[in-house]
Amino acid sequence: MVVQNERKEKICCFYVSEFHLEMILVPYINEKINENITILTEKKLRETLEILISKMNLKEDNKEKILKLGWDGEEKIKENSNIIIVGSKEFIKNKNEELENKNVLSVLDCYDFEKEKDGIDNIVKKYKNSLNTLGKNNFWNF
């Protein structure tokens, strides 16, 4: 039986460093802390995240929940989850293909700006919304 894709939202994000990525992601995750969140990443982000979280003004419970997410690799994909994918363009493409037949609430694809800057126009055409340090924005409302 094929599961109908119930994905409600597809968002992209561009970052210039791991700290920058985490400064974008932590408020987004904090807002969705009571929902399922799955992180699929090629990078080991836990060390920099711990430094950042220790300096942020968040509820202690939320800090703990955020730190328990899979920041050092791939988590098992949970149904009805908000998926965050961090990695190369190829990694992101492969993970999105894996998600095609899964029921997920949203997918946030996070690209390294320096590695993707020459092809950024082609990337953003695939998305309606972006996430940055100001929050979620619609690309086409500028």
PLM regions with names:
Residues 1-142:
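Non-catalytic regulatory/interaction regions at protein termini and inter-domain linkers
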